[in-house]
């Protein structure tokens, strides 16, 4: 999981040079981390936070700031509040949701890019990139 997050953050840093999506005032790219820090999937949320912090340390960039918010577990109200807080804080890219149960909710936030770690393939969406490992992708890798 750390390798996926390192690759993602490195890709953003190198491709966009953090200037394209960075806040104009301070030149820093604010990336939201939407993870369940409470409820049934609390351990997953803590693991995602630690993995993201390790990835950020690995790429050693002072121009990327991770802003974590609790999405709760299966709580749409808490989920939407967390997204609004991240957007208000200046995040244009959000890592999350961690599960596929909120894929329909993120369609409302068309100007925000979501990077989901879910292993379920969502229907095509303009603002969702799914980097989870699915059964289909593993079977294709075995075939090749």
PLM regions and their residue ranges:
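Short, well-structured alpha-helical segments in soluble
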Residues: 73-92, 144
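Extracytoplasmic ligand/sensor domains, especially the bilobed periplasmic-binding protein
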Residues: 93-144
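Boundary at the C-terminal end of the N-terminal hydrophobic targeting segment
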Residues: 20-24
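Bacterial N-terminal signal peptides
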Residues: 7-17
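Short beta-strand elements in bilobed, periplasmic/extracellular small-molecule ligand-binding domains
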Residues: 58-75, 125-128
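Short, solvent-exposed amphipathic alpha-helices that sit
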Residues: 43-60, 78, 138-141
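Extracytoplasmic "Venus flytrap"
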Residues: 26, 32-50, 69-71
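Positively charged n-region of N-terminal signal peptides that target proteins for export
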Residues: 1-5
């Amino acid at each position: 999981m750390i390798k996926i997050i390192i690759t993602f953050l490195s890709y953003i840093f190198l491709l966009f040079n953090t200037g394209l999506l960075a806040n104009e005032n301070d030149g820093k790219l604010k990336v939201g981390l939407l993870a369940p820090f409470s409820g049934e999937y609390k351990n997953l949320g803590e693991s995602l936070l630690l993995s993201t912090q390790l990835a950020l340390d690995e790429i050693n960039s002072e121009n990327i700031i991770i802003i974590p918010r609790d999405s709760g577990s299966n709580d749409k109200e808490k989920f939407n509040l967390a997204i609004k807080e991240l957007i208000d804080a200046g995040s244009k890219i959000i890592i999350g949701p961690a599960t596929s149960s909120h894929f329909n909710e993120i369609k409302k936030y068309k100007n925000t890019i979501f990077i989901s770690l879910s292993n379920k393939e969502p229907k095509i969406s303009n603002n969702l990139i799914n980097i989870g490992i699915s059964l289909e992708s593993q079977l294709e890798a075995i075939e090749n």
